[in-house]
């Protein structure tokens, strides 16, 4: 708090704010007094009751003064000085309120405290006359579960009730009376209840009179507005009925289910709301019945039907009657016949007046003087029944007879004059001589009665001209009472209707959140016998009802007096209604039941109001910005006054002399006194704030007047020029309206700001300056655009009549004094008028800044804001001049070109007619005119011109070496030309102008100053590299294509998108104008209604490198491209499994055709081809396997098996010989049967369908058969493609990526550079892809960017480093080696999975892996030249620790018996750990298929032998008894081995051997075997308790037992895999011997079955 207080009062001193002055009501000639006994704390708010008051100080304390009968201490009942309410100390109160005899306060935390009189429960305490001290009121919402405490923002108190406004903008009420708005019959209400009728609406403020309540409610947003229903919600009857008689139509809307139920005063507090009746009756004060009549019905404004020819007419003198529900009529009123006759006579009288020559029609005083229509209200009629209804006029008994707006011409004043003439006239007419207060009361009642005839449902009569102005297109039906229609009305009905344009500002979320809303409604309820509810009658209302005639009036504040109400609008006007006994309404001598404008001050607007018991106060802006206080209401008689005993009041509001007091910030009214809070103006701070607020409110009034008097009529004119101009004018109007609304909101917020703490830092104009700066900028831009397009000239013709008629108004509004100024000039100045306001903001903010220390943050902020507004004002002035300069240019420019070049936002910067500039090498007679606009450079020649957009224009001076001192080189995407200026100075000017224009075009912000300090820094020259959009018009390849992306010196360079008109699109990287780098390309295929789609690498405008091409036909190619063709390794998928011909090819491509080695999987035929290709056909050696087990290897020619080949069937039948077609034998050959018999000779025919044989049958001898059988199998693979010839393209691509033209030929450093580039590029591309790299992948990539350095002798450590690097490199496909491994794995799986899983292919698969190892090892040795060649030994840097005894020899040695200890370098040792785990599944499947028969025999034997318990099995296998375990340790317990024990002996060794199936590489499998032998040794040592040496005879049976118990399903496959792929140097070492033992066990188990 302290810091706040300090900053807000720094300029003033703390005792010069919130001074309290008190006047006695009725004696306004007296000077005010200071509040007796008040010390001088700054008062923020005061509230007055009948005989007491409450003060709220700046530090949140509350003081009471006056008569306080509820206090318990006698000394406190009439305190001599204000009394501190100690119960509230420490709670920090933010607002206070008083009723007649009670008070309330709201704390910072939203809690309500009440004290004072409580007879009616107004303090929310039950059964207690008085509440002496402030006590908290519990307000909780029972609708929530659990019920939540409700936080309160504002309080309002009446005589017997209190209203509270919650943080969620709902009203809570307690106390007694219908003014609570609650649906209840029991009073008092001591527990606060929600006013349900307004639940869900945003209530902005509440106010309480003695016995009535007001609420200011925010209008619903447009989308929430609903059309009025046709039928009543309660009783489902039609709201409007139409009765068709023979000669006339009667339209009645007498049905009324009022929201507020009408009750007589005596009943108001006794009854709950009765069921609404379709024919409501209103009871007057004595209980007599009279019928309500209504004058006006709103009709559908959009109706385009004319009823001139229809039968809707009405008999001239017919008046409908209705039954009166009571026999008695009020003696003080004329009867219904009298009224009817009077109305008829009066209308005839008005006709006569209208027909008199030379006389103006009578001026009608509107009830609500406002010419702007309700911009937010919904259509008030339903679409069906009402469209053809006629505007109706009231008869005296409540039935409407179709007529015209004649009732509008019927002057309300005359009706009033009839009942309210001077007392003598009244006496003469009524036959009564009474002239006292009773008579006046009667007159008021007559007045109220008469208004009720015209104000039912809160609608009112308006001046016919205002109606037409607002209604715009509202139609008049041809009336039936033609004889009564005035010529004026007929002329108006015949006039052609003009269009109306609604100037509704759009809902701006930001502004509406920060500033008070102007879209408001007023809702009232409670007692209404004085008309204080404003509904046009004197009936009470039990529930809130909207005062419709205040809709759209922008009410921002409400005040309620004893029995009158005030509404303050954003336009600084006050509407008042209710009792006017003492002239408290400020406008006439009579009361009014509908709101009317108060006539306070003709020159100045009202910005704050207060309503007392029977008077009103108005705080008014004055010329010197010091608020003036007007008083209107009760006037006490001066001494010796001998006037009659009638109440006295002011005729018009009286200005009180209070200028010497200071600046009044707030006024409060009670019963007999009123109070003002005053600020002294020490350093001009307060005066400056008042100046800002006052000028803002006046500015809003002026803008509103321009909007309603000028803009709206202009927009409704016909023939406003071209569509563009009309749109621009509408945009101007829309932006003007938005700005106007913002100013209105700001004016309203400043009014409430002046009543608060007045902190400089919370000024909206400074805190949220962008809101204002943006609105002004937008508005100025739209006006400038309108000006450039010649909008004001085009307006001249259609608007000339209107403007001439309103010339004085125009001059007055635009502040033009010179009478000779042209109309268009005035209009121009009027449209640019709002911009001047920015200077005022800057000036006032600067004034405010000078009130603070230069070092304070307030000074800095105010100073910055001031410079912001000033710089924008200057900038917008400059923009206006640019617009005028451009307009004058267009006037001189040749007409044909103007149409195509003239655009609203285009501004002229300079042109070559006044700055000599010519085209280099131009023809002698050619005319070249260069025009620089803010968005383009135009080159005009004779009647043609070319436009060069500035975003894609580069300008640079030619150097002197180029031979042109004054030359400028202009580069655009498709042109390049040189301009020669006359002088070096001209060259500099043009270069600077073009550079600045290009820079601004690229920024896209024009050159608006940056908010927050000065203008933006101007760059010397625009960037060479930039982003822009351009459509090509010349280039043959790119004609009509649009490019959007990065540019460099006139060419696409960097990321961009290129679109052709035919639908082709490229999105990706460009280099020097061509596609280069990574990109995506789409080509529509109209025939298939799909598109081809390529994603991948490009080079110099062509597909080049890795990519994926998806064809419209459904084919997908993944692989390498070169010059837009498939070239290199690639995979082509054709069709899907469900399509007609699914197939897959993976292999080498040359110039878009299959060539070299490839694998083709024909899924339909179930065949797979693995071999050589040429020109898209199988040509050369190859292998085919089928799903039925057939295997062919041999020659192919033109896709057919042709030449020598070998064919094997599933049952091992072999044919070796010549072929002529697929599976067709033709020529010499040998057919060998599975049992060894064979036929040699000539064969012809297709395999499987009968073969013709001419030859010799051989049956080999018994002894030869076993020996010769494998011969045929040994030849397998000879006619297949050699392993090293396979996948050459994959390896060549990898070498190319390393920068080598052929394997091993290149520089190592260059290879490493290429790896680094590949990693960086791929990482960058990965960032743009949707797949996000994990943290570990990112770390791997970072570690790969480090190149391993090896200096000195090669060691095991360096070897391990290389191994680690390879593992990481092969883990990421972003590395060339990783990509190679990924591709090899893909091709291997493609080859040997599915149909390729054929046991005949096992040896090919093993050879292929060995070939991979050899070729990858070559790559690794190229990258690491220090790595020794295959089979070399790396000496150990330190001998391995001894200790493990050699298993077989007993020697204490570390390794195998290699000649010297060391580490052998092999390709399999280095690369198999990386490669084999990835290839293991297909490879192991082939081993399993190949050993299928052996494995079945082995497994059957394993299952049989494992049925035996341990002891029996050990004995069966011949294990020596000394090795039998006697005891076993199970979970730490020693248990004896029994004869039934099973699966317990050597359990650790069994478990260890089972791990063999979980490893991949031979070396890992051998380690598992070695570990198993060690586990066996440990077990034996434990039982023998002594050292021993194994012999093979002892060891083999034990190991055989372990193998059996391990139950390894595919042991044969494991054995063969190790045998095929283990390092040769291991064969004769320790691991080799162990492996041989395992192999022997496998064969032994198979033979066990034979024993």
Swiss-Prot record:
Q: Which residues form the VPS9 domain?
A: 1507-1651
State the signal peptide span. none
What top-level branch of life does the organism fall under? Eukaryota
Output compositional bias ranges, type Basic and acidic residues: 439-449
Record bears the keyword Transferase = no
SUPFAM superfamilies cross-referenced by the UniProt entry? DBL homology domain (DH-domain), Histone H3 K4-specific methyltransferase SET7/9 N-terminal domain, PH domain-like, RCC1/BLIP-II, VPS9 domain
The MORN repeats lie at: 1043-1065, 1066-1088, 1094-1116, 1117-1139, 1145-1167, 1169-1191, 1192-1214, 1215-1238
| This protein's GO CC annotations | centrosome; cytoplasm; cytosol; dendrite; dendritic spine; early endosome; glutamatergic synapse; growth cone
Q: Which residues carry this modification: Phosphoserine?
A: 459-460, 477, 486, 1329
Q: InterPro entries under this entry?
A: Alsin_GEFs/MotNeuronReg, DBL_dom_sf, DH_dom, MORN, PH-like_dom_sf, RCC1/BLIP-II, Reg_chr_condens, VPS9
Q: Which molecular-function annotation in GO is an example for this chain?
A: GTPase activator activity
Query: Residue spans with biased composition (Polar residues)?
Result: 427-437, 450-461
Q: Domain PH, which positions?
A: 895-1001
Oligomer status and interactors? Forms a heteromeric complex with ALS2CL. Interacts with ALS2CL.
Its recorded name reads Alsin
């Amino acid at each position: 708090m302290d810091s706040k207080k300090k900053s807000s009062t720094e300029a003033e001193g703390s005792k010069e704010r919130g001074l309290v002055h008190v006047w006695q009501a009725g004696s306004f000639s007296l000077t005010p007094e200071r509040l007796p006994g008040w010390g001088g704390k700054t008062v923020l708010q005061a509230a007055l009751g009948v005989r007491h008051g409450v003060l709220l100080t700046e530090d949140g304390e509350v003081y009471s003064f006056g008569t306080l009968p509820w206090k318990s201490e006698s000394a406190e009942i009439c305190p001599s000085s204000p009394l501190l309410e100690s119960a509230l100390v420490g709670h920090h109160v933010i607002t206070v309120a008083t009723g007649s005899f009670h008070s309330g306060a709201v704390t910072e935390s939203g809690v309500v405290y009440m004290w004072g009189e409580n007879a009616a429960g107004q303090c929310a305490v039950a059964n207690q006359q008085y509440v002496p001290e402030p006590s908290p009121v519990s307000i909780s919402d029972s609708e929530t579960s659990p019920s939540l405490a409700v936080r309160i923002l504002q309080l309002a108190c009446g005589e017997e009730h209190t209203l509270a406004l919650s943080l969620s903008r709902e009203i809570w009420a307690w106390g007694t009376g219908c003014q609570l708005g609650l649906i209840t019959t029991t009073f008092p209400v001591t527990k606060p209840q929600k006013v349900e009728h307004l639940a869900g609406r945003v209530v902005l403020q509440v106010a309480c009179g003695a016995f009535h309540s007001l609420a200011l409610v925010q209008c619903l947003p447009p989308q929430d507005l609903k059309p009025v229903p046709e039928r009543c919600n309660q009783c489902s009857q039609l709201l409007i009925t139409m009765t068709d008689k023979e000669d006339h139509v009667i339209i009645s809307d007498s049905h009324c289910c009022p929201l507020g139920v009408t009750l007589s005063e005596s009943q108001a507090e006794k009854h709950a709301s009765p069921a609404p009746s379709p024919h409501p009756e209103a009871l007057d004060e004595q209980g007599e019945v009279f019928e309500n009549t209504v004058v006006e019905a709103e009709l559908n404004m959009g109706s385009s039907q004319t009823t001139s020819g229809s039968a809707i007419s009405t008999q001239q003198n017919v008046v409908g009657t209705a039954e009166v529900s009571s026999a008695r009529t009020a003696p003080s009123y004329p009867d219904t016949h009298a009224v009817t006759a009077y109305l008829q006579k009066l209308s005839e009288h008005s006709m006569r007046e209208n027909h008199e020559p030379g006389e103006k029609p009578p001026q009608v005083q509107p009830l609500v003087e406002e010419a702007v229509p309700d911009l937010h209200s919904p259509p008030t009629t339903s679409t069906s029944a009402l469209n053809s209804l006629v505007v109706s006029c009231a008869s005296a008994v409540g039935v409407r007879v179709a007529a015209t707006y004649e009732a509008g011409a019927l002057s309300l004043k005359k009706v009033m004059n009839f009942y309210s003439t001077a007392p003598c006239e009244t006496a003469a007419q009524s036959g009564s001589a009474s002239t006292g207060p009773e008579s006046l009361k009667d007159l008021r009642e007559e007045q109220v009665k008469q208004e009720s005839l015209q104000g039912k449902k809160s609608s009112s009569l308006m001046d016919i001209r205002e109606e037409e102005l607002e209604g715009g297109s509202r139609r008049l039906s041809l009336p039936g009472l033609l004889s009564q229609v005035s010529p004026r009305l007929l002329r108006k009905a015949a006039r052609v209707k003009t269009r109306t344009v609604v100037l509704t500002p759009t809902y701006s979320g930001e502004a509406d959140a920060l500033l008070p809303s102007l879209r408001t409604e007023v809702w009232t309820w409670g007692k209404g016998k004085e008309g204080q509810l404003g509904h046009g009658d004197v009936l009470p209302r039990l529930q809130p009802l909207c005062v419709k005639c205040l809709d759209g009036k922008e009410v921002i504040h409400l005040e309620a007096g004893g029995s009158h109400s005030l509404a303050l609008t954003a336009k600084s006007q006050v509407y008042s209604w209710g009792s006017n006994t003492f002239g408290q309404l400020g406008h006439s001598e009579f009361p009014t039941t509908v709101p009317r404008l108060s006539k306070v001050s003709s020159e100045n607007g009202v910005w704050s109001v207060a309503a007392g018991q029977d008077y009103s106060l108005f705080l008014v802006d004055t010329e010197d910005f010091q608020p003036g206080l007007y008083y209107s209401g009760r006037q006490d008689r001066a001494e010796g006054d001998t006037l009659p005993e009638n109440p006295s009041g002011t005729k018009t509001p009286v200005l009180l002399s209070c200028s010497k007091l200071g600046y009044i910030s707030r006024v409060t009214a009670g019963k007999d006194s009123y109070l003002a809070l005053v600020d002294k103006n020490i350093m001009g701070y307060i005066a400056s704030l008042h100046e800002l607020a006052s000028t803002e409110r006046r500015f809003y009034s002026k803008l509103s007047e321009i909007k309603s008097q000028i803009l709206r009529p202009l927009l409704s004119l016909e023939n406003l020029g071209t569509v563009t101009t009309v749109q621009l004018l509408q945009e101007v109007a829309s932006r003007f309206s938005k700005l106007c609304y913002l100013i209105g909101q700001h004016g309203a917020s400043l009014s409430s700001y002046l009543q608060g703490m007045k902190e400089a830092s919370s000024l909206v104009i400074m805190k949220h300056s962008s809101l204002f700066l943006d609105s002004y900028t937008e508005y100025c831009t739209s006006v400038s655009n309108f000006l450039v397009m010649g909008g004001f000239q085009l307006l001249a013709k259609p608007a000339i009549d209107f403007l001439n008629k309103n010339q004085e108004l125009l001059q007055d509004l635009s502040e033009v004094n010179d009478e000779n100024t042209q109309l268009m000039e005035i209009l121009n100045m009027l449209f640019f008028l709002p911009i001047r306001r920015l200077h005022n903001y800057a000036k006032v903010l600067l004034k405010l800044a000078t009130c603070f220390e230069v070092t304070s943050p307030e000074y800095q902020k105010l100073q910055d804001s001031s410079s912001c507004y000033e710089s924008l004002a200057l900038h917008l002035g400059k923009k206006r001049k640019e617009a005028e300069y451009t307009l004058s240019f267009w006037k001189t420019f040749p007409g044909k070109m103007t149409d195509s070049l003239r655009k609203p936002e285009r501004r002229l910067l300079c042109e070559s007619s006044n700055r000599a500039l010519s085209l280099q090498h131009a023809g002698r007679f050619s005319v070249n005119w260069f025009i620089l606009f803010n968005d383009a450079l135009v080159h005009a020649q004779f009647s043609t011109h070319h436009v060069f957009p500035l975003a894609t224009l580069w300008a640079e001076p030619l150097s002197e070496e180029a031979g042109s001192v004054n030359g400028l080189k202009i580069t655009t995407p498709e042109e390049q030309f040189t301009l020669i200026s006359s002088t070096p100075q001209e060259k500099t000017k043009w270069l600077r102008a073009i550079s600045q224009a290009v820079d601004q075009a690229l920024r896209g912000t024009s050159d608006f100053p940056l908010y927050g300090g000065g203008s933006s820094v101007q760059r010397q020259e625009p960037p060479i590299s930039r982003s822009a959009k351009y459509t090509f018009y010349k280039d043959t390849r790119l004609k009509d294509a649009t490019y959007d992306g990065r540019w460099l010196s006139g060419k696409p360079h960097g990321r961009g998108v290129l679109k052709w008109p035919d639908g082709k699109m490229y999105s990706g990287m460009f280099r020097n104008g061509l596609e280069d780098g990574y990109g995506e390309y789409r080509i529509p295929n109209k025939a298939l209604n799909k598109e081809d789609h390529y994603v991948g690498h490009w080079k110099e405008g062509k597909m080049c490198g890795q990519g994926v091409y998806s064809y419209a036909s459904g084919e997908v190619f993944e692989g390498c491209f070169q010059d837009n063709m498939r070239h290199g390794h690639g995979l082509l998928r054709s069709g899907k499994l469900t399509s007609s011909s699914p197939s897959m090819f993976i292999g080498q491509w040359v110039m878009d055709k299959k060539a070299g080695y490839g694998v083709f999987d024909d899924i339909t035929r179930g065949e797979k081809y693995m071999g050589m290709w040429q020109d898209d056909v199988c040509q050369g050696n190859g292998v085919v396997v089928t799903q039925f087990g057939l295997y062919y290897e041999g020659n192919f020619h033109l896709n057919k098996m042709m030449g020598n080949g070998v064919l094997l069937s599933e049952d091992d039948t072999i044919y070796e010989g010549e072929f002529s077609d697929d599976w067709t034998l033709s020529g010499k050959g040998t057919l060998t049967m599975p049992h060894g018999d064979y036929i040699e000779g000539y064969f012809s025919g297709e395999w499987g369908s009968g073969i013709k044989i001419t030859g010799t049958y051989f049956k080999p001898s018994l002894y030869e058969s076993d020996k010769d059988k494998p011969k045929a199998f040994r030849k397998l693979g000879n006619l297949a493609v050699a392993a090293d010839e396979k996948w050459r393209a994959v390896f060549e691509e990898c070498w190319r990526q390393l920068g080598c033209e052929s394997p091993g030929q290149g520089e190592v450093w260059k290879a490493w550079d290429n790896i680094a580039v590949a990693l960086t590029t791929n990482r960058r591309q990965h960032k743009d892809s949707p797949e996000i790299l994990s943290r570990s992948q990112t770390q791997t990539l970072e570690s790969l960017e480090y190149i391993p350095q090896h200096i000195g002798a090669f060691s095991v450590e360096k070897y391990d480093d290389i191994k680690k690097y390879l593992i990481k490199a092969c883990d990421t496909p972003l590395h060339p080696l990783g990509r190679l491994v990924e591709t090899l794995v893909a091709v291997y799986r493609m080859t040997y999975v599915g149909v390729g899983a054929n046991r005949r292919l096992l040896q090919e698969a093993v050879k292929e892996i060995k070939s991979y190892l050899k070729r990858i090892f070559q790559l690794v040795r190229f990258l690491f030249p220090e790595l020794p060649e295959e089979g070399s030994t790396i000496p150990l840097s330190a001998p391995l620790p001894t200790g493990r005894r050699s298993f077989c020899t007993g020697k204490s040695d570390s390794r195998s018996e290699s000649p010297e200890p060391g580490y052998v370098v092999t390709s399999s040792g280095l690369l198999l750990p990386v490669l084999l785990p990835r290839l293991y599944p297909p490879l192991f499947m082939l081993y399993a298929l190949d050993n299928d028969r052996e494995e079945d025999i082995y497994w059957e034997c394993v299952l049989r032998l494992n049925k035996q318990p341990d002891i029996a099995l050990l004995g069966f296998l011949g294990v020596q008894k000394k090795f039998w375990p006697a005891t076993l340790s199970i979970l730490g317990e020693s248990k004896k081995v029994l004869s039934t024990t099973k699966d317990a002996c050597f359990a650790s060794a069994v478990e260890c051997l089972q791990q063999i199936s979980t490893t991949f590489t031979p070396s890992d499998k051998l380690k598992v075997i070695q570990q198993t032998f060690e586990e066996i040794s440990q077990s034996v040592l434990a039982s023998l308790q002594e050292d021993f040496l194994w012999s093979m005879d002892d060891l083999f049976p034990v190991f055989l037992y372990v193998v059996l118990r391990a139950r390894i399903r595919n042991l044969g496959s494991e054995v063969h895999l190790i045998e095929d792929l283990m390092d040769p140097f291991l064969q004769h070492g320790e691991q080799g011997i162990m492996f041989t033992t395992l192999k022997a066990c496998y064969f032994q188990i198979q033979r066990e079955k034979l024993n």
